């Protein structure tokens, strides 16, 4: 039997709250790590959503803790990581799942949309990388950082200029931090999903290209969680600075969002996500 080396490990997952009607990457990642034997602190801006994920963890016999924090605020990120480390009595794995997007023709992207998109997808990732690295370095025992990137960060996608630029920044941040922190035994990797096949029922079907662009079909949230599990585990003990595409093969087929998508469909998708995107 293969030992993943996660039994008794201590993990933090940001963006782990369970949103009603959406499976969510964060929820799946937190539960999957717990199933592998890790104790998991679930961080979300809404403590109730974090507690919902902890309930799922407890149902599978795992150990979880809920923690509320605004991960878009650097001081609150530092505070939350400190509390999480106290809860767990240390830290071995830190996973960043926070992110958000909207679709806009590039010439229509406002300064506000650009700045918010970078804040949600790149700046907050930097905050969490920095905070977790300080704890890992102080411990002196190494650790694993895993971030959620995107296929849009490695290839072009229409109407995603801001999001693609932010996720490309995440991919580069992963490489830079992996290079700098390797001497401390800290591994830094990323998982880049494409269009996920479940957990996104409120996203209009018309935004996505037909299934034929996915040779292996669209990935599930569990597929994303499995990739995170690999990077967090001892199986990836000599893997760092990498971003793994989990997209059903879409990236090698080219863009998966139709360049001729109707703007009203795009606007419907933006409206569906605005409850999370527009809170600042």
Model-inferred region functions:
Residues 3-41:
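Canonical Rossmann dinucleotide-binding motif of NAD(H)/NADP(H)-dependent dehydrogenases/reductases
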Residues 23, 107, 155-161, 183, ...:
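Active-site loop immediately N-terminal to the catalytic Tyr-X3-Lys motif
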Residues 105-106, 110-118, 209-210:
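Substrate-binding pocket helix/loop in short-chain dehydrogenase/reductase
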Residues 150:
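Residue(s) in the substrate-gating loop at a strand-loop-helix junction
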Residues 190, 206-239, 244-248, 270-272, ...:
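C-terminal helical subdomain
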């Amino acid at each position: 039997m293969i030992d993943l080396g996660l039994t008794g490990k201590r993990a933090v997952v940001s963006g782990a709250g369970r949103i009603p009607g959406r499976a969510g990457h964060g929820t799946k990642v937190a539960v999957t790590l717990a199933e592998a034997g890790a104790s998991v602190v679930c961080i979300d801006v809404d403590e109730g959503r974090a507690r919902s994920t902890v309930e799922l963890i407890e149902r599978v016999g795992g150990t979880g803790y809920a923690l509320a924090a605004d991960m878009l605020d650097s001081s609150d990120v530092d505070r939350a990581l400190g509390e999480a480390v106290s809860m767990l009595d240390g830290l071995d794995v830190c996973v960043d799942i926070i992110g958000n997007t909207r679709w806009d023709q590039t010439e229509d992207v406002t300064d506000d949309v650009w700045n918010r998109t970078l804040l949600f997808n790149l700046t907050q990732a930097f905050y969490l990388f920095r905070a977790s690295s300080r704890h890992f370095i102080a411990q002196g025992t190494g650790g694993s950082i895993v971030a959620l990137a995107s296929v849009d960060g490695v290839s072009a996608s229409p109407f995603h200029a801001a999001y693609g630029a932010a996720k490309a920044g995440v991919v580069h941040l992963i490489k830079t931090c992996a290079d700098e922190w390797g001497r401390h035994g800290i591994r830094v990797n990323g998982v880049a999903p494409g269009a996920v096949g479940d957990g996104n029922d409120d996203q209009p079907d018309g935004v996505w290209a037909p299934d034929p662009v996915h040779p292996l079909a669209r990935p599930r949230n569990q597929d994303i969680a499995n990739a995170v599990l690999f990077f967090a585990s001892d199986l990836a003990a000599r893997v760092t600075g990498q971003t793994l595409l989990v997209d059903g093969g879409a990236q090698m087929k080219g863009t998966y969002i139709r360049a001729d998508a109707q703007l009203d469909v795009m606007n419907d998708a933006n409206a569906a996500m605005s409850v999370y995107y527009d809170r600042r």
